[in-house]
């Protein structure tokens, strides 16, 4: 009975951390959208809070990895395996890969090594990864509802 209680508690820590990551990622994307608007002639350069975008992006990425490790650790603790959640786990790997590429490109941009084209690629990769995040959220709700 004690193990079952631990399993259900652990199962809710992962989605809470991931939800915090998603909220900070959406805010980071909103800040990045301001830059995109400026480059298209809408607004001034001062409208884009560069440092704030970088800080929130770092928070998002760190929370995303923490959430991933909690999810993987919880699965390993409960089941003794990692990829028992099937498509949810594989989609998580794709999401982490896409955001890792986006963060790497963002790092190059923050060091002044990028072009407008690189900034656009950075934005497209990160925004498209959020499509997979929406699918992942649906899968997570299914897991919490039917499998725990």
PLM regions: where:
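Membrane-embedded alpha-helical bundles that constitute the cytochrome b-like, heme-associated redox core
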Residues: 1-148
């Amino acid at each position: 009975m004690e193990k079952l209680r631990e399993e259900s508690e652990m199962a809710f820590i992962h989605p809470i951390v991931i939800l915090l990551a998603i909220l900070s990622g959406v805010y980071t994307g909103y800040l990045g959208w301001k830059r995109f608007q400026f480059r298209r002639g809408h607004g001034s350069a001062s409208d884009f809070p560069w440092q704030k975008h970088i800080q929130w992006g770092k928070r998002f990425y760190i929370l995303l990895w923490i959430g991933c490790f909690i999810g993987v650790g919880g699965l390993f603790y409960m089941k003794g395996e990692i990829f028992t959640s099937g498509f949810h786990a594989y989609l998580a790997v794709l999401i982490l890969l896409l955001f890792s590429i986006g963060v790497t490109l963002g790092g190059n941009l923050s060091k002044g090594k990028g072009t407008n084209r690189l900034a656009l690629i950075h934005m497209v990769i990160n925004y498209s990864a959020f499509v997979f995040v929406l699918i992942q959220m649906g899968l997570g709700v299914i897991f919490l509802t039917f499998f725990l």
